[in-house]
Amino acid sequence: RGTLQAQVHVLHTACAIAPQDRGLLLVVRGAWTLQGEDGTTQCAAEQGVWRDGEPRAWQLTPVGDAAVLLWVHLYQTSL
């Protein structure tokens, strides 16, 4: 039996995320380009992507100077 823990990162600049099997990418302000192994998605504020399953890597690129994205990495821990 296990539980999930979260690490929350606030992003303002482009970055690459190593493969992870669960998490949330949520645009808070502006727009971001989310490039994953299965395609590219453009997300505006209050939009994002949720993953739970097969690990995926991401390349995240802000569109404009004021863009902000939350990356919530969820990972399993034992009790």
Model-predicted segments: where are they?
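Glycine- and acidic-residue-biased ligand/ion/polar-headgroup-sensing regions
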Residues: 1, 19-38, 46
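Ligand-binding loop in jelly-roll beta-barrel domains
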Residues: 1-4, 42, 53-79
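Conserved short histidine dyad/triad with adjacent acidic residue
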Residues: 1-20
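Generic preference for hydrophobic/aromatic residues in regular secondary structure cores
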Residues: 6-8, 25, 36, 69
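Short acidic-glycine-tyrosine-enriched beta hairpin
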Residues: 13-16, 36-56
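Short, surface-exposed loop and linker segments with low hydrophobicity and enrichment for Pro/Ser/Thr
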Residues: 14-25, 58-67
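Ordered hydrophobic segments in well-structured contexts
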Residues: 22-28, 47-50, 67-75
